[in-house]
Amino acid sequence: MHMHFGAEEMFFVLSGRPVFRNQHGEEEMAAGDFVFCPEGRAGLHTFSNPTEEPAQILAISAGSFPDVVAYPEHGYAWVATRDPDPELLARGGDPGIITRFEIPIE
């Protein structure tokens, strides 16, 4: 799971049956379902797709940069200075993602 300290996120399920997980548990979702994740600890979340059916989710982020994205289960965080460039990420890096910090996150 991860959380943002610079952005809120909204997710709208377009198809499939993805599972949304946050600090309160898991919920299977379906087309038409919506979830809002606020900035900070209250917005801790992740999705999975335990079925063989493809799932599509429209993700909308609203925030500012820099954005610190923390992964408390793994003990690291990213700092982003802007939206990542998908083409640069596919080639192994993006200068908009400054660095990954190995830090204890509680």
Predicted regions and their residues:
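Double-stranded beta-helix
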Residues: S48-E106
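Short beta-alpha junctions and helix-cap segments that line functional grooves
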Residues: L44-T46
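Short non-domain terminal segments
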Residues: E9, P18, G32-F34, V69, ...
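Short, conserved beta-strand element in jelly-roll/cupin
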Residues: M3-N22, I60-S64
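Conserved short histidine dyad/triad with adjacent acidic residue
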Residues: M1-H4, P38, A42
